[in-house]
A protein has these predicted regions:
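C-terminal flanking tails of non-heme Fe-dependent oxygenases
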Residues: 1-9, 202-211, 218, 225-246
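An N-terminus-focused feature that recognizes amino-terminal "leader" regions
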Residues: 1-154, 172
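Eukaryotic intrinsically disordered and solvent-exposed regulatory patches
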Residues: 12-13, 160, 201
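Extended non-catalytic domains of envelope/secretory-pathway proteins
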Residues: 18-21, 179, 186, 243, ...
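Acyltransferase donor/substrate-recognition loop-hinge adjacent to the catalytic core
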Residues: 135-177, 191, 196, 221-241
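Active-site rim elements
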Residues: 175, 248-249
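Beta-propeller domains
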Residues: 175-223
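Conserved small/polar residues in nucleotide/adenosyl-binding loops
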Residues: 251-253
């Protein structure tokens, strides 16, 4: 489904890669009981490696996978969790130029998000994505530094990459959508980022079925399968009813 992230060439803005995408930076989670979520992540081998300087936000990491748990009461994440329950409320793409990617996304019809930015805190541009979740654009990574050096304090050594359970990178993030909405979201990613479909599945079970379009970014490092139910009895429909909307579903590492 694309090159192993470390083998892919550095991102450049081009006709093929108009946003200069370069992989995932993080996934942000919200939970009515953030401590319980933290315990689950630690059982999976993630470690709390940094804490936000002024907010109840913790960075968990394993290998190159960054999971942010946002427990800040007065935040987008808290409001999102109050509406949807435990969820992935945001994700971030690495891009060559965050300002350029944000402005291009808005010009192509994406809905901007303007959040609260505290003193001495980075302002990371974002748009509304699947189910009203946020999609951030990050260009501060690798040789250009780290967003975590600015907004977070490391709990131990700087920028560690613990490898507790053998997870190294985020392979893909699944989206579950309402029936009839798959083409809309596939078109959204194609229009903004030039994602392409690399595989189509039509899975029919004894009682229910689903279709899935597996999309990948021009850089080959971001993969998003979009799932749609074929009826109202499937597990996907159950997820959507319980969640009260379309969602960032499973994160696969």
């Amino acid at each position: 489904m694309g090159p192993f992230p470390h083998d892919a060439p550095p991102a450049e803005i081009s006709a093929h890669n108009p946003m200069g995408t370069d992989g995932f930076e993080f996934v942000e989670f919200a939970h009515p009981d953030p401590a319980e979520l933290g315990r689950v992540l630690e059982l999976m081998g993630f470690r709390p490696v940094a804490r936000h300087r002024s907010k109840a936000v913790t960075l968990y990491r394993q290998g190159d996978v960054n999971y942010i748990v946002n427990a800040e009461p007065d935040s987008f994440a808290a409001a999102f969790a109050a509406e949807h329950g435990p969820c992935a409320c945001a994700m971030a793409f690495r891009v060559k130029d965050a300002k350029y990617a944000y402005e291009r996304a808005i010009a192509l019809g994406a809905e901007p998000y303007i959040g609260k930015v505290g003193p001495m805190e980075l302002s990371i541009p974002a748009v509304r994505g699947i189910g009203g979740s946020l999609l951030y654009f990050v260009d501060r990574y690798g040789d250009k530094g780290s967003i975590y050096d600015v907004d977070f304090v490391w709990t131990g050594e700087r920028d560690p990459h613990p490898e507790q359970a053998g997870l190294y990178y985020l392979d893909h993030l699944t989206h579950n959508v309402h029936r009839g909405r798959m083409d809309f979201w596939a078109g959204w990613y194609e229009k903004l980022f030039n994602f392409r479909e690399i595989r189509f599945f039509n899975i029919e079970g004894k009682l229910t079925g689903l279709i899935s379009r597996a999309l990948t970014s021009p850089c080959g490092k971001i993969r998003i399968p979009i799932n749609e139910s074929l009826d109202d009895k499937s597990q996907i429909e159950e997820y959507l009813r319980e969640y009260k909307g379309e969602e960032i579903g499973r994160a696969h590492v």
